[in-house]
């Protein structure tokens, strides 16, 4: 549970908020992108004659880099996985990225954090070009001060390094002079929580996305939120979610 010292409170709630950063994952946190991703994964696998895994296995493709998922769940070598990923992009880059929808009350959440002067960032393992197109599609790009996605040419592939870059670009401290942490990482998979914890963030795991409550607990999420309203309550400190 995050504690805020009385000295910190005395400086005023507005100042606290102005020093804070919130970093969101995209898939499974801001948007429900299951349809577009899984249809595009299926398209890619069928194009190369692979058997389609059961749905519960396909769900594991939501979150980590897809090249890794093709190797892990379909037994591909790296070179083959990269070819299949390219085929995935043929469909996802034109159709699949828009087979997607915002979760309920996301706009209200983004309004809140902008109005309360958080620095707002996106950190996603999705290629950054897709992430920006999706934010534009939903007319929410203006809420974000920083957007960082995967960029293979720059060596940005895994969540920890993507999150690290987002934190650096935000330019705010991780803690105040009392040691209270100032950066939230909000995501639905263990990769979000583990990366946030390793980098000194306050980790908020959302159970409405693609990771299970067990997965988020095992990753040591500091807070668990069952819906977007729970995120709002957590940020308001009106309802402190106990570490489970």
Regions found by a protein language model. Give the residues of each.
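Substrate-recognition element of Asp-dependent hydrolases with the DxDx(T/V) motif
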Residues: 41, 109-135, 148
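Asp-based, Mg2+/Mn2+-dependent phosphohydrolase catalytic module
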Residues: 2, 13, 18-20, 134-244
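Hydrophobic alpha-helical segments typical of transmembrane helices
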Residues: 54-57, 66-69, 130, 162, ...
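Conserved Rossmann-like nucleotide-cofactor binding loop
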Residues: 29, 36, 128, 191, ...
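N-terminal helical cap/lid subdomain that shapes the substrate entry/recognition surface
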Residues: 19-108, 116
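Short amphipathic alpha-helix in the helical subdomain of ABC transporter nucleotide-binding domains
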Residues: 81-85, 131, 159
């Amino acid at each position: 549970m995050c504690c805020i010292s009385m000295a910190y409170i005395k400086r005023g709630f507005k100042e606290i908020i102005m020093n804070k950063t919130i970093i969101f994952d995209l898939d499974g946190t801001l948007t429900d992108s299951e349809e577009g991703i899984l249809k595009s994964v299926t398209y890619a696998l069928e194009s190369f004659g692979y058997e389609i895994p059961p749905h519960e296995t396909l769900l594991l493709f939501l979150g980590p880099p897809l090249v890794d998922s093709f190797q892990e769940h379909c037994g591909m070598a790296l070179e083959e996985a990269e070819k299949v990923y390219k085929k995935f992009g043929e469909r996802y880059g034109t159709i699949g990225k828009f087979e997607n929808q915002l979760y309920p009350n996301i706009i209200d959440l983004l309004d809140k954090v902008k109005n309360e002067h958080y620095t707002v960032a996106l950190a996603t393992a999705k290629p950054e070009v897709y992430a920006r197109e999706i934010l534009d599609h939903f007319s929410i790009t203006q809420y974000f001060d920083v957007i960082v996605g995967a960029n293979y040419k720059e060596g940005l592939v895994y969540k920890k390094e993507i999150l690290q870059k987002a934190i650096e670009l935000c330019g705010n401290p991780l803690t105040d002079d009392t040691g209270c942490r100032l950066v939230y990482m909000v995501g639905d998979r263990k990769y979000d929580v583990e990366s946030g914890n390793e980098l000194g963030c306050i980790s908020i795991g959302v159970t409405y996305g693609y990771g299970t409550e067990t997965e988020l607990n095992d990753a040591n999420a500091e807070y668990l939120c069952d819906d977007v309203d729970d995120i709002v309550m957590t940020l308001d400190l009106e309802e402190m979610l106990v570490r489970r």
